[in-house]
């Protein structure tokens, strides 16, 4: 029996959650991971393999963290210098976490936001990464069948994180490219009315700020609009701020915490913040997720639920020491922002030379790339055809816009901070060759008689890579064999 097959006996024995497809494994977002898992690029061992550009990971400042750890061996209980605290740290810790860690996280969150707002350590709840923290908040706020309004495009993993086990629902707030995908009050009201017409109880709005996949930040007016909207409807606002330290140019990041403190008559108990060290520090493997809620009951219940996904005390101990080093934190935040900005500028500059534009962005570790001109027609079917060529022939794992529920075909999220400079060069060269090939085919097609043009329409999606000739019509779907390192096993943003 294959991995994806469930026989009749197991259908009777297993739960509905175990039997359904709520994980979202069949999304193109995860299909790209499967293609990478089966044929990963390596500059020497597999130079023609798939380059991972679907992983929103920040590896640009690892050297600074490694250098700090090397200089502070006492921060780890697994070194001779830190061994004296081994017993006290290795013993059972309560759900609150280590006090020094919560204090350090609160201070760090304040620094990331420019010191314009302070966070109360007693309101910090820890969870197993942003995925675990997100799900915990949904469990606290919603019953099965309740709905949340989420502006689209949104992070593809939300379909898993927010819905799968909680049985909550997502109602999309449709945003479009005509205003750079900004959220409007009108769009919120339309989505709210749609939920009411479907007899769905709306429990809140969920945003990611800075946005994944757009790489843009919400301005103050939009944040105030969101707060006013949830106050009027007496529903919750959950703000995922896990990319807040990746802002590399103006406008600066504005946290919902700042708006809450400034707005009069704000119902603070409706506001909740999700945070993590996965993106800002580049430590997704440490599985540090944070819930910061202004609601006392949510803090209490989320803390109790966190027993299902605690952060290890060893991890807390190490990070408490690191984040308490204010000189290091200041230097890290400044340098990391600089490096992300430089990589973004280099990447978008080279794309621009190829005639490829991206949404103007100021944050995140990815670009929202516009390939609409390469579609044979403006449909999501054409987007998927183009995506399969990029995955299987160009050998780049980029994520199609449809996996983020965008309303316009032809957009792709491309991550740029999870690789070294040499791999970036290889990726850019592949993109350049691909676009150049398409442009040549387009020129040839324009010169053909109309009947020939129609017959050879698929030439727009043909590509020659390393001596091999491909055509979209002959492309196989992405493989479905799951690697043990796949995000289908290890949740990743």
UniProtKB/Swiss-Prot annotation:
One of its GO terms (molecular function) is pyridoxal phosphate binding. The gene is ACC1A. Keywords: Ethylene biosynthesis, Fruit ripening, Lyase, Pyridoxal phosphate, S-adenosyl-L-methionine. It comes from the Eukaryota. Pathway: Alkene biosynthesis; ethylene biosynthesis via S-adenosyl-L-methionine; ethylene from S-adenosyl-L-methionine: step 1/2. The modification N6-(pyridoxal phosphate)lysine is found at residue 279. This is 1-aminocyclopropane-1-carboxylate synthase 1. PROSITE patterns: AA_TRANSFER_CLASS_1 (PS00105). CDD domains: AAT_like. Coiled coil: none annotated. The lineage of its organism: Eukaryota, Viridiplantae, Streptophyta, Embryophyta, Tracheophyta. Catalyzes the formation of 1-aminocyclopropane-1-carboxylate, a direct precursor of ethylene in higher plants. One of its GO terms (biological process) is ethylene biosynthetic process. Belongs to the class-I pyridoxal-phosphate-dependent aminotransferase family. Its cofactor is pyridoxal 5'-phosphate. Its EC number is 4.4.1.14. Gene3D superfamilies: Aspartate Aminotransferase, domain 1, Type I PLP-dependent aspartate aminotransferase-like (Major domain). Pfam families: Aminotran_1_2.
């Amino acid at each position: 029996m294959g991995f994806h097959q469930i026989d009749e006996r197991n259908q009777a024995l297993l739960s509905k959650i175990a039997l359904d497809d709520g994980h979202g494994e069949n999304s193109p977002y995860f299909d790209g991971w499967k293609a990478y898992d089966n044929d990963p690029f390596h500059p020497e061992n597999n130079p023609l393999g798939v380059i991972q550009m679907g992983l929103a990971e920040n590896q640009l400042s690892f050297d600074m963290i490694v250098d700090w750890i090397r200089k502070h061996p006492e921060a780890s209980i697994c070194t001779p210098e830190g061994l004296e605290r081994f017993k006290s740290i290795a013993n059972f810790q309560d759900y609150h976490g280590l006090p020094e860690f919560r204090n350090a996280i609160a201070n760090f969150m304040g620094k990331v936001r420019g010191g314009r707002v302070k966070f109360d350590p007693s309101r910090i709840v820890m969870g197993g990464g942003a995925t675990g923290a997100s799900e915990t908040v949904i469990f606290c706020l919603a019953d099965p069948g309740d709905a949340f309004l989420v502006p689209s495009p949104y992070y593809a993993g939300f379909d898993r994180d927010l819905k799968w086990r909680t049985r909550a629902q997502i109602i999309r707030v449709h945003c479009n490219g005509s205003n750079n995908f900004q959220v409007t009050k009108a769009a919120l009201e339309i989505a709210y009315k749609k939920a009411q017409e479907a007899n769905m109880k709306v429990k809140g709005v969920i945003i990611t700020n800075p946005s994944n996949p757009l790489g843009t930040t919400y301005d103050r007016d939009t944040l105030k609009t969101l707060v006013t909207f949830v106050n009027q409807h007496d529903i919750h606002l959950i703000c995922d701020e896990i990319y807040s330290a990746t802002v590399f140019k103006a406008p600066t990041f504005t946290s919902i915490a700042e708006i809450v403190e400034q707005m009069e008559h704000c119902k603070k108990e409706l506001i909740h913040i999700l945070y993590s060290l996965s993106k800002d520090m580049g430590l997704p493997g440490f599985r540090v997720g944070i819930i910061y809620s202004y609601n006392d009951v949510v803090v209490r219940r989320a803390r109790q639920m966190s027993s299902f996904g605690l952060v290890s005390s060893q991890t807390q101990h190490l990070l408490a020491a690191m984040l308490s080093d204010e000189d290091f934190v200041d230097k890290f935040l400044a340098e990391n922002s600089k490096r992300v900005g430089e990589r973004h500028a280099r990447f978008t500059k080279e794309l621009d030379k190829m005639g490829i534009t991206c949404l103007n962005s100021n944050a995140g570790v990815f670009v929202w790339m516009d390939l609409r001109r390469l579609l044979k027609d403006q449909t999501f079917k054409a987007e998927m055809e183009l995506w399969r060529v990029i995955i299987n022939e160009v050998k780049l794992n980029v994520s199609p816009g449809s996996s983020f529920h965008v309303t316009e075909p032809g957009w792709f999220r491309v991550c740029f901070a999870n690789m070294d400079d040499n791999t970036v060069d290889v990726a850019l060269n592949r993109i350049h060759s691909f676009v150049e090939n398409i442009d040549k085919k387009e020129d040839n097609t324009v010169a053909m008689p109309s009947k020939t043009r129609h017959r050879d329409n698929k030439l727009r999606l043909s590509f020659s890579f390393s001596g091999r000739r491909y055509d979209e019509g002959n492309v196989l779907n992405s493989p479905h064999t799951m690697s043990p390192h796949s995000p289908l096993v290890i949740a990743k943003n």
